[in-house]
Curated annotation (Swiss-Prot):
One of its GO terms (cellular component) is Holliday junction resolvase complex. Binds 2 Mg(2+) ion per subunit. It comes from Dictyoglomus thermophilum (strain ATCC 35947 / DSM 3960 / H-6-12). Mg(2+) 1 binds at residues 7, 140. This is Crossover junction endodeoxyribonuclease RuvC. Its EC number is 3.1.21.10. The keyword Electron transport does not apply. SUPFAM superfamilies: Ribonuclease H-like. Mg(2+) 2 binds at residue 67. PROSITE patterns: RUVC. The gene is ruvC. GO terms for biological process: DNA recombination; DNA repair. Its main location: cytoplasm. Homodimer which binds Holliday junction (HJ) DNA. The HJ becomes 2-fold symmetrical on binding to RuvC with unstacked arms; it has a different conformation from HJ DNA in complex with RuvA. In the full resolvosome a probable DNA-RuvA(4)-RuvB(12)-RuvC(2) complex forms which resolves the HJ. It is found in: Cytoplasm.
Amino acid sequence: MIVIGFDPGTAITGYGILNKEDDKIAVIEYGALTTPSNWSIGRRLNYLFDQVSSLLDLYNPDAVVMEEVFFNKNIKTAISIGQAQGVIILAAQQHQREVSILTPLEVKLSVVGYGRATKDQVQYMVKEVLKLKDIPKPDDVADALALCISYIYKQEGC
């Protein structure tokens, strides 16, 4: 099962692609889709759509996962995350894929075992579970990989 996870934003969208086969979780690819701050919102969203579509074409994932938008004190940030989420959902829909939405609590519980885990604890567990040399950077990438791990564990009933 190939799972792609996204931590959306208009400036940086982290992504991770994992393959679950038998009892093993293997990293296929991970990275960040970034846009210059001087680009218009339309140009940023168009670029994000094209890049997400390319990843979906290339890897043909069985599942697409994103984190639920949480309440953010900065309304501008919350709106920009929502716009990026909409673009990812549209790209997935055009590839006949539904997007599974996980809450931060679900991700922390499944990856760390504690719903109030810190970002550092989640990132450490991502590194350990995937047997990576270093914690993926930027944080958005580690978050996207955590979403994939959480989705896989959820499918296994963990």
